[in-house]
């Protein structure tokens, strides 16, 4: 199951961060269903669906210890955090592409909406950071890496 790009023990933080992020994503999706499908613009719903597919691919890569798992974690983690800040935290300046919790119309936004959005942003940042560390660890332990001294 493992391509042995680094030990299973070293891979554990990436797996844990990915599962945590996937859980935060799922809770946020539940909040969208709770708020009602009409609460968000169609572009947000389409974007969330595309994000769900990308998250699923990243989960599979991480759980299979694929060599590109750290890069997937970096892209999904930091990308999701940035998109969530834009879509839910910033004031509305492109209403067709935002579901802002800070400016109108805020349809059915509750404390649970805020908790799930902040959890996904935080989990995304953590996933991206853990992905960076995993990639750095893989690069420094790579047997192909040759250093020459001049």
Language model feature labels by segment:
Residues 24-35, 78-95:
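C-terminal TM-helix exit segments that contain a strictly Trp-centered aromatic cap at the helix terminus
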Residues 102-123:
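Individual transmembrane alpha-helices with interfacial aromatic-anchor signatures
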Residues 21-23, 42-64, 75, 82, ...:
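Core segments of alpha-helical transmembrane spans in multipass integral membrane proteins
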Residues 139-150:
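Short, highly charged, low-complexity non-transmembrane loops/tails of multi-pass membrane proteins
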Residues 7-13, 29-42:
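Short juxtamembrane and helix-loop transition motifs at transmembrane-helix boundaries
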Residues 1-22, 129-138:
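Cytosolic juxtamembrane helix and N-cap/initiation of the first transmembrane helix
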Residues 19, 72-86, 149-150:
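Transmembrane alpha-helical segments of multi-pass membrane proteins
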Residues 14-27, 79-83, 119-123:
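Alpha-helical transmembrane segments of multi-pass integral membrane proteins
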């Amino acid at each position: 199951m493992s391509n042995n790009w680094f030990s299973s023990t070293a891979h554990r933080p990436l797996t844990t961060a990915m599962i945590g992020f996937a859980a935060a994503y799922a809770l946020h999706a539940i909040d969208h269903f709770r708020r009602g499908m009409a609460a968000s613009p169609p572009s947000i719903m389409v974007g969330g669906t595309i994000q769900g597919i990308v998250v699923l691919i990243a989960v599979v890569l991480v759980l299979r210890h694929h060599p590109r798992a750290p890069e997937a974690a970096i892209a999904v983690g930091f990308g999701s955090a940035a998109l969530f800040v834009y879509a839910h935290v910033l004031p509305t300046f492109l209403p067709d592409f935002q579901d802002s919790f800070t400016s109108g119309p805020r349809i059915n936004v509750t404390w649970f909406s805020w908790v799930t959005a902040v959890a996904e942003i935080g989990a995304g940042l953590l996933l991206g950071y853990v992905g960076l560390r995993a990639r750095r660890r893989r690069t420094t332990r790579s047997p192909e890496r040759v250093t020459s001294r001049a």
